[in-house]
A protein has these predicted regions:
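Phosphate/NTP-binding elements of NTP-utilizing enzymes
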Residues: 1-176
């Protein structure tokens, strides 16, 4: 698996503060780590079963030539829009998973942080994001699935939105 943080410093920090602590603190994980010292460093973690975890940053050297079944891009809107003149992070990352065909997966997470490119844009369909770059642009490239809930009273499905959720506001909080 390849996990790509937004910078080299953040990749190092994530590895040392999160992963290394978890690996040391969990006996179950620790026994699965390779016993050879040179197999595990700040950016590379090797396990006894042969699996490999790479912690990288947006760079063509990191995001080229190696195949990964799973790639995760964190805080995507803080990535450069064009990585080393080779393209956007998602395109480069998803290319790493093509060897695994439908078993490969590219996960991207971020808070939207890019400006909308066309201030006069109007939605043409209910499942459409405005023209922009970053994580919001990936929504339009995907299959645009949304989560729908079943109404407990009539069984009809609806998209959860504040204006569609009625009838609960005057009820006491059952979790207090």
């Amino acid at each position: 698996m390849l996990v790509v943080q937004m910078t080299e410093d953040k990749a190092r920090e994530h590895s040392k503060k999160r992963l290394d602590r978890t690996f040391r603190s969990s006996a179950a994980v620790k026994k699965r780590m390779s016993p050879r010292r040179n197999d595990n460093n700040v950016h590379d973690k090797t396990f006894r079963d042969g699996s490999f975890l790479k912690i990288g940053w947006p760079s063509v050297n990191i995001m080229s030539s190696s195949d990964y079944r799973f790639v995760a891009l964190t805080d995507y809107d803080r990535f450069p829009e064009n990585i080393d003149s080779e393209g956007d992070g998602f395109s480069l990352a998803s290319k790493r998973t093509t060897t695994f065909m439908s078993a490969g997966m590219t996960l991207v997470e971020s808070s939207p942080g890019r400006d909308i490119c066309d201030s006069k844009w109007r939605r043409k369909s209910p499942h459409e994001a405005p023209p922009t770059t970053g994580i919001l642009s990936l929504y339009n490239r995907g299959d645009r699935r949304r989560w729908y809930w079943s109404c407990p009273h009539c069984g009809e499905y609806f998209q959860p939105a504040m204006d569609a959720m009625t009838g609960y506001r005057n009820e006491p909080d059952p979790f207090k």
